[in-house]
Amino acid sequence: MSRIILSLDAENADLKARVAFLEQQLFGPKSEKMTAIDPTQATLDLGDLTDIPAAANDDVAPVAEGPKQERRSPSRNIGRLPRHLPRYEELIEPESKICPCCSFELHCVGTDVSEALDIVPAVVRVKQTIRPSYACRAGESVIVQAPASARVMGESNVAPMRLAFCLAHARRKFVDVVKLTGSSEAGR
């Protein structure tokens, strides 16, 4: 009788271990961590690994150090707009081209060009905003540039008309769906 009880207890313990393992697999974390691996694998005896001698590098030729390549700083590329689209330019000049320090006329030292996808109904084009930078020939510390026009969505390249077109198109699709849903419910 006690032998039957012991075998039933062993079987019960085995079944509880299986249920616990399956519950862990079903409801536990979904990544491959030590808890999801068979617990007997973690108890492998690898011996004393600290007694392994280090390999001698006597017969290895010394590596000649060449010039290190400079790492370029990562540059953002949010994508170039297609070249086949027509472009128009918008030139934004500073309010004054007179140097605030010495009152001489400023000369152009560079430009910043940004592009945004603009849409006029049935015409898609690229709007180029050009902002020249001006500097004084007498004093090299002053650079004047008109402030950039505000973007609709952060650093995106979408013009306000393009965004308005997308929103109007999305609203039109939504209204069409609501009309269809309403008419199908009215027929019931």
Curated annotation (Swiss-Prot):
Chain intervals for the UniProt region annotation (Disordered): 57-80
Keyword terms of this UniProt record: Plasmid
Domain of life: Bacteria
Pfam family, one: LZ_Tnp_IS66
Family named by the database record: Belongs to the transposase 25 family.
PANTHER family documented for this protein: BLL1576 PROTEIN
Protein name (database record): Uncharacterized protein y4aQ
Lineage: Bacteria, Pseudomonadati, Pseudomonadota, Alphaproteobacteria, Hyphomicrobiales
